[in-house]
Amino acid sequence: EVQQGQTPGRVMVACRTYPAEGMVVNTESEKSHATRRECLEFLLKNHPLDCPICDKAGECDLQDYTYQEGQSTGRSKEGRRHAEKRHSLGDVIVLDQERCVLCSRCVRFFEEVPKKAQLTVSNLGSRSVISTFADRPLTGNYQGNIADLCPVGALTLKKFRFQARVWNLVKQASTCPECSRGCSIQVEVLRGGEVKRFRPRENKAVNGWWMCDTGRFAFDHVNAPNRLANALVRSGHALAEASIEDGLAAVRALLDAHADALFVASPFC
């Protein structure tokens, strides 16, 4: 609710209201809460009650806002709108058109970040849906970011779909190992030790808010059953397990035994 001067307070859309001198903003007035409840009622009118099986449950903006505002009933007596539940957008993303709230974040992402428009809002009115041009599959190496951007469970990763509940994931800040850029990421591990997903972590100096799909899905080798869990140091013709410290000491000894190094090669450079 915005009040300026002697004019009565009015409810304004925050993202379209410019600040001005003498403006008083009250986000907790009864009028503000009532307006938010009305907006939520409109969004929930056709939104399916999929929370128990939705991958976004636990990190869903719409779910959080509904709990905050206490809106648990609706006045509409009409049936819910139905649309395609499992619409494949290519190798990475699945679209649930019933859950979509038409915020158009995904549309704007492709237009503004990779600069290649691929999604659009097609049809009109209550039949509006997100779709690709001519129903073509999405392309490019940044598709996974739209699953992070989606405020509901409309856009989900095929690789993470039905794999874990988010409240069972232990989250740890890390750095993507896939290339020399070193994007800041969040590693999410299921209780028990299996890595379930990598997600971008905000770092304006490196990757901003995004990460490429190559890095996003670069964790299969971490869960590989034949993955090396310890350093190996050669002793004669055999390799013996050693601690990380002993392994680094062996590498240091090999480097010290030769002339000064001109460069160090790495598959990640």
Model features per residue range: what roles?
Residues 48, 96, 103, 108, ...:
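Catalytic alpha/large subunits of respiratory electron-transfer oxidoreductases
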